């Protein structure tokens, strides 16, 4: 706010009926009657998101809180639309993301966040080799937490990371649903996976942090202090490098 800058944003549509008019996801996915009737009228569709370039650079103190600020915005959206029970949209992976990492990530997501009711299906699903026994054998942990750590280690072996936004959703709610993956020819061929989050099922600490006014106030004070400390460290490091012969 002090800099009067837009950090980032989310395109969204607040749904009020069972007709998926103008929804981005409707171009690539078919919705079941159950989804149209019981979910869509109470849904906020989240479209393309962005973080402005000056907040994307690693090592820049500004970049630390960019994603957090976007979640603050989503929290405000939930508060302003009390009828909404679901967040629905697509998470994106680029074709430069290594396929073995992509497949391991999607296998994990479908294992722990399945769509057992076939609420949403892709019109042209991306061919994924998820039946390869390699992926099932990869996850030897006893629960979500252990297999999550295995996933992180495996992906890092290929010098990749779980995309930050996907990682945020994975740790937002235990009842998230993950649907099919498609290639989006209208946006450079990126690979997009549809997801659904039930707002009342969001972990209490996340809900408190991003949707309650008291939570916003505490979070803002905390982030201001963290930003002040990180900025001081950043300036100290810059000054030290500048004074070196």
What does each model-found stretch correspond to?
Residues 180:
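Glycine-rich, charged/polar anion/phosphate-binding loops
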């Amino acid at each position: 706010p002090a800099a009067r800058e837009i950090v980032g944003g989310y395109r969204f549509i607040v749904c009020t009926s069972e007709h998926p008019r103008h929804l981005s996801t409707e171009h690539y996915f078919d919705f079941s009657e159950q989804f149209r009737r019981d979910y869509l009228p109470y849904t906020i569709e989240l479209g393309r998101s962005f973080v402005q370039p000056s907040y994307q650079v690693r090592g820049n103190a500004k970049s630390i809180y960019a994603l957090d600020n976007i979640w603050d915005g989503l929290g405000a959206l939930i508060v302003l639309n009390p009828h909404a029970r679901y967040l629905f949209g697509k998470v994106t992976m680029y074709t430069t993301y290594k396929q073995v990492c992509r497949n391991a990530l999607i296998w994990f997501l479908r294992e722990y966040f399945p769509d057992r009711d076939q609420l949403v299906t892709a019109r042209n699903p991306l061919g994924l080799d998820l039946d390869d026994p390699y992926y099932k054998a990869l996850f030897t942990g006893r629960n979500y937490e252990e297999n999550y750590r295995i996933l992180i280690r495996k992906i890092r072996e290929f010098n990749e990371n779980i995309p930050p936004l996907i990682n945020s959703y994975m740790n937002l709610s235990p009842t998230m649903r993950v649907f099919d993956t498609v290639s989006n020819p209208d946006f450079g061929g990126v690979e997009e996976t549809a997801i659904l989050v039930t707002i009342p099922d969001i972990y209490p600490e996340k809900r408190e942090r991003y949707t309650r006014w008291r939570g916003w106030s505490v979070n803002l004070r905390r982030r201001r202090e963290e930003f002040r400390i990180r900025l001081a460290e950043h300036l100290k490091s810059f000054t030290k490098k500048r004074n070196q012969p």
